[in-house]
Structure formats: C-alpha cells, structure tokens
Amino acid sequence: MKGAVQQEPAYVVHRRPWRETALLVDLFTLNHGRMSVVARGANSTKSPLKAQLQPFQPLLVDWTGKSELKTLVQLEVRSAPAVSQPRALYSGFYINELVQRVLPVADPSPALFASYIETLQALADLSSQDDVEPLLRRFERAFAASLGYDFAWDETTDTGMSVQAGELYGYDPGQGIVSNLAPELPLRQLPGEALLALAAGDFISEAPRKTAKRVMRVLVDYLLQGRPLHSRSLFSHSNPSSGRES
C-alpha cells in the first residue's frame, strides 16, 4: 500500500468533526512530526474510535495516503497514567495547542517527542500542591529548540561573554540573552543572578522562576506570530488571582 505507515507512536493534539461521520485529527508522532489524518466513521455513535482518539493517550497508529492529509487505517491504544488534575489538564491542553499551531507538518523531532512524553508523565503525577510552571518552562525550552531557537541562559549572543551576577541583560527572541539594553528589545532588566540560576537548572526559586516565565512568554509569542492560544485563558479562569501560568 503506497504511503503506508504502521505502528507509529503518536498522540492526539487536536481533533474536530469532518464531513458527516469522520474526525480530522492532528497527531504528534515520533518519526513523522505533526501529521493530519482522517478517521472515517469515528464521529458516529457506534464507532470505538471516538473514545480512543483522546488527548494524552499514547497510541500506535497506521495510516495511508500520498497527500499531506492521510487516512487512518488502524490504531492501538497503549496504557499510560491519566492526566486528570485540573492544572495538569490545562497544561496538557497548552502544550498540545503549541504543537498543533506552531510545529510544521511532517518535520520529525524525536527529542521534542521525548520531552512531550516526559512532560505528560510529570503532569499525570502532579498533585494539587505541585508547581506546574517548571514543567511548562522546560517543555517550552525544548519546543523552541526544536524550531532552531535554542539559547544559553548564561551567555550573551551579541558579545559571547558569560553572564555576570549583579549585571542586567536583555532578551531578543531571535538572538537570545544579550548584553545590549536597547529600548526596542521586548525584555530588558533581566538580573544576571536569575539567569545564572536558570542555567544551573533552578526554575523554582522566585527570581529565576519569574525571569524564565517572562522570557519564555516572549519567545512563545514570537513563535506564534500573532496566533492566539485559547488554552491560556483556562489558567486565568481557573485561578484569576494567580496570574497566567503560561
């Protein structure tokens, strides 16, 4: 069968009704990146596919087709811990929306796929007291790196110099951390101590946590190019006093 793919590890990142009884499903896959498939009959009441094609559920999928839009042939549901805690669900919807809206079609990134699975596993283990922000920041970082926007927290790209405690720095999404504090930069006044803490892996302490949130917000918005993320509103609606998580 031409264009056939079998037993491909995949997750549903978005789905919607298509024509009379089908679903149009966006998948994030290990070896093919983001792919769109038509699941024929999946939107009918008698089809088991509708219950199986759920977000956060690991799948093995078969599809066929030579065009960009493939046809789902078969799928196998794999076991995994459920993502059920409300903030974990909202966070999962957020990373799914990032993948669905920004990742190019048919551009595989095994490293990002591994980060995606790791993030879902951590979200499944999240308790009501756990902090979700470090998980989101790490995924955002891996997501940006997969698109060519990686950077070092502790080195300036405009001078190649190491970040110093006690100094202030800027951030440009097209470059990374910079020593230049030009007015046109989207972020300035980033404390060197916080950047060094982030380079050491500290996403929990107050100053690096806030700095990472500011930087990754600017970077994600840059990658979105004006496209909205509906999942962001879930955080503010669930806890208006806490501010935006993502």
UniProtKB/Swiss-Prot annotation:
Transmembrane segments: none annotated. Signal peptide: none annotated. One of its GO terms (biological process) is double-strand break repair. It comes from the Bacteria. SUPFAM superfamilies: ArfGap/RecO-like zinc finger, Nucleic acid-binding proteins. One of its GO terms (cellular component) is bacterial nucleoid. It holds the Pfam family RecO_C. Keywords: DNA damage, DNA recombination, DNA repair. HAMAP family: RecO. Belongs to the RecO family. This is DNA repair protein RecO.
